[in-house]
Regions:
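Glycine-rich, charged/polar anion/phosphate-binding loops
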Residues: 128-131, 191-198
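Short gly/pro/ser/thr-enriched loop/turn and capping motifs at secondary-structure boundaries
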Residues: 44, 150-153, 215-217
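Short, proline-centered helix/strand-breaking motifs
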Residues: 141-143, 176
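Glycine/aspartate-rich loop-and-adjacent alpha/beta segment that forms the canonical ThDP
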Residues: 199-267
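Conserved thiamine diphosphate
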Residues: 106-112, 162-195, 239-266
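Cofactor-/ligand-binding subdomain signature composed of acidic, glycine-rich
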Residues: 1-10, 32, 245, 252
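Residue-level marker for buried hydrophobic side chains located in beta-strands
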Residues: 117, 144-145
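Cofactor-binding active-site loop characterized by glycine-rich and histidine/acidic residues
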Residues: 8-138, 156-162, 167-174
């Protein structure tokens, strides 16, 4: 936010702060040979798949040293060597691209899978139906991963669809749908995504995954967030921070000590 206000970042920026568990838990199942596409809020997946942070920040600043040579900005990040085939500023724009990439993997018999990351709002775009239908018909190796953060810009998802859970749409296409109610628990997301990955890697066709999470900030840097109460946002920030929850998990399971985690935090 500070860099945006100072004019360092060029163009619109859409933060994924608060959705760290959803991003990391999903991407940990992907190798560099797998492929993923994402949306305007794709920084989280890009970081989780080891995008060079200096090059990412250079891209946000519009510099030629950026991952997209300074021409893509915040919404168009790509790192082909690590399977990141691009984030997309068009709502629902990644679906058809992912289906095409999945068709290539199937045709070449690579054994790799493709993931299309999106928010809840994009699932009401026509391209979602068209892409899932084609992927299901041809049994393509693609996962449609939905991060349901409850709001499509300012539209509450409960006012935008009569379907209480988006993953249930999978039934209409004859494919499995997987649901993670607690998308701020990175281990829960990892387990849910693992089931979908096993299904798709097994040559059984596509799957839909829905995880429920929450973005701390507005839809973009231009969004004042007046459609949400301060109490609602503070509840998520103070009591459901995915990073703090994972930190507590590591300590409670004796995987890492408080001192070790403090040292990592200071390095960051």
């Amino acid at each position: 936010n500070k860099l945006v206000r100072r004019g360092f970042v060029q163009g619109m920026t859409h933060f994924s702060v608060g959705e760290e568990a959803a991003n990391v838990g999903a991407v940990q199942h992907l190798s560099y040979d797998d492929i993923f596409f994402s949306n305007h809020r794709g920084h989280g997946q890009s970081i989780a798949q080891d995008m060079d942070l200096n090059k990412m920040m250079a891209e946000l600043a519009g510099k030629a040293t950026g991952v997209s040579k300074g021409r893509g900005g915040s919404m168009h990040l790509a790192d082909f060597e690590k399977g990141n085939y691009g984030t997309n500023g068009i709502v629902g724009g990644s679906y058809a691209l992912a289906v095409g990439a999945a068709l290539t993997q199937q045709y070449k018999e690579t054994g790799n899978i493709v993931v299309a990351f999106s928010g809840d709002g994009a699932t009401n775009e026509g391209s979602f139906h068209e892409s899932v239908n084609m992927a299901a018909t041809w049994k393509l190796p693609v996962i449609f991963f939905i991060i349901n953060n409850r709001y499509g810009i300012s539209m509450d998802i409960r006012r935008a669809t009569n379907t209480p859970h988006l993953y249930t749409r999978a039934e209409a296409y004859g494919i499995p749908g997987f649901y993670c109610e607690d998308g701020n628990d990175v281990m829960a997301v990892y387990d849910t995504m693992g089931k979908a990955v096993d299904h798709v890697r097994g040559g059984n066709g596509p799957a839909i995954v829905e995880v429920e999470s929450y973005r701390w900030f507005g839809h973009s840097t231009a969004d004042a967030g007046v459609y949400r109460t301060k109490e609602e946002v503070d509840e998520w920030k103070n009591n459901n921070d995915p990073i703090i929850r994972y930190r507590d998990y590591l300590v409670s399971e004796n995987i890492a000590s408080v001192e070790e985690l403090d040292a990592i935090q200071s390095q960051v």
